[in-house]
UniProtKB/Swiss-Prot annotation:
Name of the protein in its database record: Regulatory protein RecX
A Pfam entry, by short name: RecX_HTH1
UniProt keyword Cytoplasm, yes or no: yes
Record-level GO cellular component terms: cytoplasm
Gene assigned in the entry: recX
Keyword flag Nucleotide-binding: no
GO aspect biological process, one term: regulation of DNA repair
Upper classification of the organism: Bacteria, Bacillati, Bacillota, Clostridia, Eubacteriales
Disulfide-bond pairs as recorded: none
Localisation per UniProt entry: Cytoplasm
Similarity field: Belongs to the RecX family.
Function: Modulates RecA activity.
């Protein structure tokens, strides 16, 4: 069993503390953990206590990293996990950090999905939105539930505006209506609109142009 012979606050980082066991430097931990665990000079530390300290320290560092990750932009659970794994934190610490973030609603895949859909509907179709969210680690059930509430007519209106702008660019270089329709079709599909919406929108765009003419 080792004895705690010195607890030294680091000069460059007052939130970190160096621990000395039996007269020799052992490792450093956060000052918060020293107070939390009531560590004192001359106290005896058994191997189990050392292991617990190491685990607690890893978790605290992992949690701090997780908070920095979400500091500027809202993230999905998968995005946070992936970034923590890149920093080589152990799975147990990552799980605890994620649990902490969820507890205080710092990450919420349901809320993220709502915000993402509302924002991206102005520039892409529901299929691309779904694919993008799946890649971000959002479960299919959450995505499908939110997309069910989607205003289909609003999606068509947005698709029409996008298609109209593209059409105005294409018709300056192309006069063949069949080729124009083909280019519009591929463009809208690439934007994530399904075949039904795409076909309806193209017909409307072409019809509007004929009426204007």
């Amino acid at each position: 069993m080792a004895k705690m012979t010195k607890i030294e606050i680091q000069k460059r980082n007052k939130e970190r503390v160096n621990l000395f066991l039996d007269g020799e430097y052992a490792f450093s931990i956060s000052a918060e953990l020293v107070y939390k665990e009531s560590l004192k000079v001359n106290s005896e530390i058994n191997p189990e206590k050392l292991r617990t300290l190491a685990e607690s320290e890893n978790f605290m560092r992992c949690k701090e990293s997780a908070l920095r990750i979400i500091e500027k932009t809202y993230k999905t659970e998968k995005e946070v996990r992936d970034k923590l794994k890149l920093k080589e934190y152990d799975e147990s610490s990552i799980d605890k950090a994620i649990e902490f973030l969820k507890k205080y609603n710092f990450i919420n895949d349901g809320n993220y999905t709502k915000i993402f859909i509302k924002d991206k509907l102005r520039s892409m179709g529901s299929q691309k939105i779904k694919y993008t969210l799946l890649r971000k680690g959002i479960c299919k059930e959450i995505i499908d539930e939110e997309l069910l509430n989607l205003d289909k007519e609003n999606e068509k209106d947005v698709a029409f505006d996008i298609a109209q702008k593209k059409y105005n660019l294409i018709k300056n270089k192309e006069t063949d209506t069949y080729k124009i329709s083909g280019k519009l079709y591929r463009y809208l599909i690439s934007k994530g609109y399904n075949t039904e919406v795409t076909s309806q929108v193209i017909k409307k765009v072409m019809a509007v142009d004929v009426d204007d003419f």
